[in-house]
């Protein structure tokens, strides 16, 4: 069995301003730094076997302390990145609505099929995340004992992982709320996934 601990990175300055930061870096805020300490304390008694993040500094910074505490190397996975917002990286939806009204209208109309200029659609991001999480599960699967895998990633990525593991599609993507520094836990046995914790933040 695999116990999958999914952590959304701690609060960033861009998060506070409502700015889209898919593939660009955004610094952890002062509040986020406190969240990191609380995440580390909460997970200190967990038996963690592997730690994965994305190349984004906000994910690596979030779990650096717990990784060192557990004497584990962080393994970066490019495919677990947030959706690429392309030309709209660093902007707010309000800015997009005002400066690019036609594109904003197209975004609303096309929904999950909408592809950001020079970026991705939700479906694009779902496909790469689904393939990567399947590979991670296959690499770490063991019939003999339970392995605990920690992944620190992004809200969109975590939604993609959950909807993929419970339904095999992206259709429930928007049904899950994923807060900054939240912990979601899934147990996967024989290809069947059960949600043990969902968007858990009581420790913060």
Feature locations, PLM:
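General small-molecule cofactor/ligand-binding pocket signal
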Residues: 5, 75-77, 196
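Phosphate-coordination/substrate-recognition cap region in phosphate-metabolizing enzymes
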Residues: 39-104
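Active-site-adjacent alpha-helix immediately C-terminal to a catalytic or transition-state-stabilizing loop
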Residues: 60, 131-194
């Amino acid at each position: 069995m695999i116990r999958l601990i999914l952590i959304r990175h701690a609060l960033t300055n861009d998060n506070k301003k409502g700015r889209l930061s898919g593939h660009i870096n955004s610094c952890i805020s002062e509040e986020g730094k406190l969240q990191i300490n609380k995440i580390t304390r909460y997970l200190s008694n967990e038996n963690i076997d592997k730690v994965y993040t994305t190349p984004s500094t906000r994910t690596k910074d979030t779990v650096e302390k717990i990784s060192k505490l557990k004497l584990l190397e962080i393994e970066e996975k490019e495919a677990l990145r947030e959706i690429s917002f392309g030309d709209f990286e660093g902007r707010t939806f309000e800015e997009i609505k005002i400066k690019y009204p036609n594109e904003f209208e197209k975004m609303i109309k096309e929904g999950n099929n909408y592809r950001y200029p020079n970026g991705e659609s939700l479906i694009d991001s779902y496909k790469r995340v689904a393939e990567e999480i399947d590979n991670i599960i296959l690499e770490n699967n063991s019939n003999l004992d339970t392995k605990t895998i920690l992944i620190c990633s992004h809200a969109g990525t975590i939604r993609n992982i959950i909807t993929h593991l419970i339904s095999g599609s992206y259709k429930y993507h928007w049904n899950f709320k994923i807060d900054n520094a939240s912990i979601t836990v899934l147990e996967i046995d024989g290809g069947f996934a059960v949600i043990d914790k969902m968007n858990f933040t009581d420790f913060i």
